[in-house]
Amino acid sequence: MFIGREKELATLNGLYNSDKFEFAVIYGRRRVGKTALISHFIQDKKAIYFMGVESNEKQNLENFSQAIMEYASGIMPGTSFVSFQAAIEYVFKLCENERLVLVIDEYPYVAKASKSMASTLQMLIDKNKDNSKMMLILCGSSMSYMEDNVLAYKAPLYGRRTAQMKILPFDFKDSCKYFNRFSAEDMALIYGIVGGTPQYLLQMNDSMSVEDNIKNVFLNPASAIFEEPENLLKQEVREPAVYNAIITAVATGSSRMSEIATKIGETTSVCSQYMKNLINLGLIRKETPYGEKESRKSIYAIADNMFRFWYRFIPDNNSIISRGATELAYKRIAPNLSDYMGRIFEEICMQYMWKLLLDGESPVEFSNLGRWWGTDPQERIQTEIDIMGDQDKSTALFGECKWINENVDVKVLEKLKKRSRLFRYENVHLFLFAKKGFTQGCIEEAGKMGNVSLVTYDQIYEYLNDRGITAF
């Protein structure tokens, strides 16, 4: 079953239908579904699909030759081309009169094994593109390699591509499509636990409770995910121990560079380079208060939900998990799940806000959204706003998100109203998001104010999943 990626498929099909030479670059983290996307795209098309392996040039060339032989007739079985140049020239020959897709998956493995691969492709593209019906797709999981050696200005292939796609994990809406039997609340928890990476979503079983899924997948040493974060780091970086320490520090509450450096016992200059690599891998993101330039107020957060959950709960409980004390480990995790879900709920609420905007239903036509934190000059205390976005210098929205089992009280609305006055906007709209609902007092005050939207999680879930209800 293939889910989502409608825009990416539309782009690929548009390129294919041009019937002229096209060169698409597809890249993204491991497990996000790049190969599944390509396989779905070429399933009804003439195509040569070759996946590079982490081996030498000879092995990769033999595998590439085999892929070509499986498509083309007139080549003796067991034949191997003498070089990648000869092999690719042969494929260009096949594309003189027919539309053919050539896919080189895990391209970084091939290019590292064959140092002349990029310049060979450059030469052959320049020579044949004007008279070729080839659609070339280069795909890779090493994002730094693809960005530096395929997409970058100094790369040999720069200027040859006709499209590029960075494949990201699914958002909450598309993640929901994987399941039919989870309740709305359980679906939020599942998204908070594994995020939108297809390979991780497939580990979840909607015939089981969230508790049993956590026990079966995260608290089970035999599961595919149990060592996934550490294994992925080993594949991507040279010093996984330091990266592990950094991610653990962020997951357990250290958010500023100085705090992280102190926590792991390294200097901030050393930490900053590691952090840059983690950002490039899509595992960490740097956040700055909305509307402000990068400053000392910038903080770091884990960008991937599965990594966030794993590093928040597994390392501290690793010893008892390894000894089979699943129930004890879950007993330690369960009381912290509601607090953990707070930031996940903010993320879901922002996705809701973006859909409102795209559907033309947002009361404020913002250009961006983000969190804000800083000092309240009147009370001289640190404060924060969960969601903020502005349309122009006079119009903005502010949001507060509460993942709690009680109805949200009017005091929360009053606090949000007060925080919004830290900024000099003439027109302000307030959003209160609640897991459960709102007290009567909160509902009445929102009605009096007239510039407030009260939105429950159930409404968000129904709206994001196109169940035909009003936005709020």
Per-range role (PLM):
Residues 1-330:
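Phosphate-binding site recognition
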Residues 290, 299-472:
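A cross-kingdom feature that marks ATP-driven nucleic-acid transaction machinery
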